[in-house]
């Protein structure tokens, strides 16, 4: 007659295995689609992405001093070590924070943002005073790369402008451990390039002026004389600190920074962000190994910074939602 074998005693500590903190989405390395050949109305070829930008949107409550920005750097030391990413703060500890004033303008029904456009003005400050010219930033941000590239954001101005086309990597909206991609087709230029009293002075701006400067916005115009207003009646103060350099190997290095947005005057903290980006000329020359390290580091950092992260948010969306009635963005 067979003898029954008593089951081995189990430890309460071993009853629930610790889940592995791995990626929950397929790797995006090598999966960003190639653009189909196309051209703008003037015959110029469509723009191609030249930046990869990784962003974590953060709760702002842990950032209350310049030193607290560097405290966030301690959070990703382990993810960096795990994936062979070098992180150094040499030369950054002494650098001051950077201050910018940022405001957004839109129609009363958020027609720009609902159609994936963002229009803002920003002014840098130093020692409490504005420096340089106010800058206009106009962008089309969307998850469809081809649509983003074919949207001609170039302004109709006499002065020069600069285009920045970015692949933006963000966490998933609903859980940690994944990556979703947005494509941001930007143009920026000094306000003086379009004359005095246009964009950035929200009470002087209407849709007609906006369409003259940005012809692509004719698609959102309903009628002449429509007014543009300051979004959420709020002017933002951005406080940004470069905290170090990340080295992913194979020549792929970039600055890392932490920033918070708060309301001007009340200094009410709204949202934070950790970001790093690098520029490239030819995507085929980017090291796949370095990109995989970038991705693995970004995934691990999400888990390490769990107490900081604000899933499903962007800085712009936070401003638009300040007074309720959130728009239907494409983000």
Where are the regions that the model predicts?
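Phosphate-end processing signature that detects enzymes handling 5′-triphosphorylated RNA
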Residues: 2-331
